Regions:
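Interhelical loop and helix-boundary elements at the membrane-water interface
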Residues: 1-144, 154-185
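Transmembrane helix-loop junctions at the membrane interface of multipass transporters and ion channels
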Residues: 146-150
Length: 185
Protein backbone atom coordinates (compact mmCIF):
# COMPACT_ATOMS: atom_id res chain seq x y z
CA UNK A 1 0.00 0.00 0.00
CA UNK A 2 2.85 2.42 0.81
CA UNK A 3 4.32 1.79 -2.63
CA UNK A 4 0.96 2.69 -4.22
CA UNK A 5 0.72 5.89 -2.18
CA UNK A 6 4.25 6.94 -3.12
CA UNK A 7 3.55 6.18 -6.79
CA UNK A 8 0.39 8.31 -6.77
CA UNK A 9 2.26 11.21 -5.18
CA UNK A 10 5.23 10.88 -7.56
CA UNK A 11 3.25 10.35 -10.76
CA UNK A 12 0.91 13.28 -10.23
CA UNK A 13 3.53 15.70 -8.92
CA UNK A 14 3.73 17.68 -12.22
CA UNK A 15 -0.01 18.44 -12.04
CA UNK A 16 0.20 19.34 -8.37
CA UNK A 17 3.09 21.70 -9.07
CA UNK A 18 1.19 23.24 -12.00
CA UNK A 19 -1.80 23.84 -9.75
CA UNK A 20 0.14 25.67 -7.03
CA UNK A 21 2.54 27.62 -9.27
CA UNK A 22 0.14 30.48 -10.18
CA UNK A 23 -0.28 31.32 -6.49
CA UNK A 24 3.47 31.25 -5.87
CA UNK A 25 4.44 33.40 -8.86
CA UNK A 26 1.67 35.99 -8.40
CA UNK A 27 3.84 38.38 -6.35
CA UNK A 28 6.86 38.16 -8.69
CA UNK A 29 7.32 41.52 -10.42
CA UNK A 30 9.08 40.05 -13.46
CA UNK A 31 5.92 38.24 -14.54
CA UNK A 32 3.48 41.14 -14.14
CA UNK A 33 3.31 41.73 -17.90
CA UNK A 34 1.58 38.35 -18.20
CA UNK A 35 -0.98 39.34 -15.59
CA UNK A 36 -3.83 39.65 -18.11
CA UNK A 37 -6.92 37.44 -17.71
CA UNK A 38 -7.10 34.52 -20.12
CA UNK A 39 -10.80 35.19 -20.70
CA UNK A 40 -9.94 38.69 -22.04
CA UNK A 41 -12.67 40.11 -19.78
CA UNK A 42 -15.42 38.38 -21.76
CA UNK A 43 -18.78 37.66 -20.17
CA UNK A 44 -21.40 34.96 -20.52
CA UNK A 45 -24.90 35.59 -19.17
CA UNK A 46 -23.64 38.91 -17.77
CA UNK A 47 -20.93 37.17 -15.72
CA UNK A 48 -17.21 36.90 -16.35
CA UNK A 49 -16.29 33.71 -18.20
CA UNK A 50 -13.39 32.84 -15.88
CA UNK A 51 -12.61 35.94 -13.89
CA UNK A 52 -9.58 38.11 -13.27
CA UNK A 53 -7.74 35.46 -11.22
CA UNK A 54 -7.16 33.16 -14.21
CA UNK A 55 -4.23 34.85 -15.94
CA UNK A 56 -1.73 34.17 -18.69
CA UNK A 57 0.96 34.44 -16.00
CA UNK A 58 -0.57 31.54 -14.11
CA UNK A 59 -1.13 29.43 -17.22
CA UNK A 60 2.35 29.93 -18.69
CA UNK A 61 4.16 29.48 -15.37
CA UNK A 62 2.06 26.46 -14.38
CA UNK A 63 2.65 24.67 -17.69
CA UNK A 64 6.37 25.49 -17.58
CA UNK A 65 6.72 24.18 -14.02
CA UNK A 66 4.78 20.99 -14.79
CA UNK A 67 7.09 20.34 -17.73
CA UNK A 68 10.20 21.09 -15.68
CA UNK A 69 8.96 18.82 -12.88
CA UNK A 70 8.37 15.90 -15.24
CA UNK A 71 11.76 16.43 -16.86
CA UNK A 72 13.44 16.40 -13.43
CA UNK A 73 11.51 13.25 -12.53
CA UNK A 74 12.70 11.59 -15.73
CA UNK A 75 16.30 12.55 -14.93
CA UNK A 76 15.94 11.28 -11.35
CA UNK A 77 14.52 7.94 -12.53
CA UNK A 78 17.49 7.54 -14.88
CA UNK A 79 20.04 8.39 -12.19
CA UNK A 80 18.75 7.20 -8.82
CA UNK A 81 17.48 3.83 -7.65
CA UNK A 82 15.17 5.44 -5.07
CA UNK A 83 13.36 7.29 -7.87
CA UNK A 84 12.93 4.10 -9.91
CA UNK A 85 11.11 2.52 -6.96
CA UNK A 86 8.42 5.23 -7.25
CA UNK A 87 7.52 4.74 -10.90
CA UNK A 88 5.23 1.73 -10.69
CA UNK A 89 4.61 0.40 -14.20
CA UNK A 90 5.29 3.76 -15.88
CA UNK A 91 8.35 3.71 -18.14
CA UNK A 92 9.77 7.18 -17.51
CA UNK A 93 12.65 6.59 -19.94
CA UNK A 94 10.24 6.58 -22.89
CA UNK A 95 7.73 9.22 -21.86
CA UNK A 96 7.34 12.18 -24.24
CA UNK A 97 8.47 14.50 -21.46
CA UNK A 98 7.80 17.89 -23.03
CA UNK A 99 4.42 16.92 -24.47
CA UNK A 100 3.30 15.10 -21.33
CA UNK A 101 4.57 17.90 -19.08
CA UNK A 102 2.61 20.45 -21.10
CA UNK A 103 -0.46 18.20 -20.92
CA UNK A 104 -0.13 17.81 -17.14
CA UNK A 105 0.00 21.60 -16.83
CA UNK A 106 -2.77 22.35 -19.33
CA UNK A 107 -4.96 19.60 -17.89
CA UNK A 108 -4.54 20.77 -14.31
CA UNK A 109 -5.04 24.45 -15.10
CA UNK A 110 -7.69 23.75 -17.72
CA UNK A 111 -9.66 21.74 -15.17
CA UNK A 112 -9.33 24.65 -12.77
CA UNK A 113 -10.49 27.10 -15.46
CA UNK A 114 -13.55 25.00 -16.29
CA UNK A 115 -14.45 24.86 -12.61
CA UNK A 116 -14.00 28.65 -12.42
CA UNK A 117 -16.45 29.08 -15.29
CA UNK A 118 -19.10 27.21 -13.32
CA UNK A 119 -18.26 29.14 -10.14
CA UNK A 120 -18.77 32.43 -11.99
CA UNK A 121 -22.08 31.20 -13.40
CA UNK A 122 -23.23 30.23 -9.90
CA UNK A 123 -22.14 33.62 -8.50
CA UNK A 124 -19.40 32.15 -6.31
CA UNK A 125 -16.96 35.07 -5.86
CA UNK A 126 -13.32 34.68 -6.99
CA UNK A 127 -11.17 33.34 -4.19
CA UNK A 128 -14.10 31.71 -2.40
CA UNK A 129 -14.12 27.93 -2.13
CA UNK A 130 -16.53 25.57 -3.80
CA UNK A 131 -15.93 22.23 -2.09
CA UNK A 132 -15.19 19.64 -3.42
CA UNK A 133 -14.91 21.03 -6.95
CA UNK A 134 -12.05 23.41 -6.11
CA UNK A 135 -10.06 20.45 -4.85
CA UNK A 136 -10.84 18.00 -7.66
CA UNK A 137 -10.78 20.16 -10.80
CA UNK A 138 -7.05 19.96 -11.50
CA UNK A 139 -6.93 16.24 -10.65
CA UNK A 140 -9.69 15.36 -13.10
CA UNK A 141 -8.36 17.70 -15.80
CA UNK A 142 -4.79 16.38 -15.68
CA UNK A 143 -5.94 12.76 -15.44
CA UNK A 144 -8.13 13.06 -18.54
CA UNK A 145 -5.50 14.62 -20.80
CA UNK A 146 -2.71 12.21 -19.79
CA UNK A 147 -4.71 8.99 -20.27
CA UNK A 148 -3.56 8.53 -23.90
CA UNK A 149 0.05 8.38 -22.67
CA UNK A 150 -0.24 6.77 -19.24
CA UNK A 151 -3.41 4.87 -18.42
CA UNK A 152 -3.63 3.80 -14.80
CA UNK A 153 -5.95 1.27 -13.20
CA UNK A 154 -9.21 2.44 -11.62
CA UNK A 155 -7.70 1.67 -8.22
CA UNK A 156 -4.69 3.86 -9.00
CA UNK A 157 -6.94 6.73 -10.13
CA UNK A 158 -9.07 6.40 -7.00
CA UNK A 159 -5.98 6.50 -4.79
CA UNK A 160 -4.58 9.41 -6.77
CA UNK A 161 -7.81 11.39 -6.33
CA UNK A 162 -8.01 10.76 -2.58
CA UNK A 163 -4.32 11.50 -1.93
CA UNK A 164 -4.17 14.66 -4.00
CA UNK A 165 -7.44 15.86 -2.50
CA UNK A 166 -5.79 15.60 0.93
CA UNK A 167 -2.58 17.22 -0.37
CA UNK A 168 -4.65 20.07 -1.82
CA UNK A 169 -6.48 20.65 1.46
CA UNK A 170 -3.21 20.72 3.41
CA UNK A 171 -1.51 22.99 0.85
CA UNK A 172 -4.49 25.38 0.80
CA UNK A 173 -4.45 25.68 4.56
CA UNK A 174 -0.67 26.23 4.55
CA UNK A 175 -1.09 28.89 1.85
CA UNK A 176 -3.64 30.65 4.01
CA UNK A 177 -1.33 30.51 7.05
CA UNK A 178 1.47 31.99 4.93
CA UNK A 179 -0.87 34.74 3.66
CA UNK A 180 -0.63 33.50 0.08
CA UNK A 181 -4.38 32.84 0.02
CA UNK A 182 -7.29 34.85 1.38
CA UNK A 183 -9.19 31.80 2.67
CA UNK A 184 -8.09 28.41 4.03
CA UNK A 185 -10.22 26.42 1.55
Amino acid sequence: MLKDVLFALWFFLPAGIANVTPILVAPLPGLRRLDAPIDFGLTFRSRRVLGAHKTWRGLVSGVAMATLTLWLQQLAVGQYAWARTLTGSVDYAHLPTVLLGVLFGLGALGGDAIESFFKRQRDVPPGHGWFPFDQLDYIIGASLVTIPFVALSLRQYALLIVLWLVVHLIASYAGWLLHLKERPL
